[in-house]
Amino acid sequence: MTPRGGYIGAQLLPFKLGLGGQVADGKHWVSWVSLDDEVAAIRWLLRNEVTGPVNITAPEPVTNARWTKAIGAALRRPTVIPLPLPIPRLLFGSDFVDEAMLSSQKVLPGRLTEGGFTFGDTEIEPALMRLLRE
């Protein structure tokens, strides 16, 4: 995660303006990982023998509702205005919204945790607090 781009970067302006809110019912899953943990996981993978695909994601995915509250708390902004689906569908197209914003991604880092990798950031709230208040 970085505020300079990607999923968080695209969301920052509305949240900073106090217009951030959960998408639809907020029940879809969001998998995330801090940049520090991503780099550490890649280094760990280079030093350890692991076979098969590896998911580099934090061990605790969150719902969009929790994600939204965590960003709002980190920025000290309200998150009471939900984003009605017609708005992003009009702006970005239905296919993009359905695939990128609404698809549930409850991905777990099974190979990393089974192999003994230790995450530094396991909960979204403190990770976003540190990231967005730097």
Q: Where do the language-model regions lie?
A:
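Flexible, glycine-rich beta-alpha linker
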Residues: 1-10
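Residue-level signal for the nucleotide or nucleotide-sugar donor/cofactor binding architecture
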Residues: 2, 30-33, 62, 107, ...
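Alpha-helical substrate-binding/gating segment
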Residues: 9-20, 28-62
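Alpha-helical membrane-targeting segments
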Residues: 10-32, 73-104
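Short glycine-/small-residue-rich flexible loop motifs, especially phosphate/cofactor-binding loops
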Residues: 12, 69, 109-111
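Mid/C-terminal beta-alpha module of Rossmann-like enzyme folds, strongest
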Residues: 41-42, 48-95, 129-134
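C-terminal amphipathic/interface module of NAD(P)-dependent oxidoreductases
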Residues: 99-134
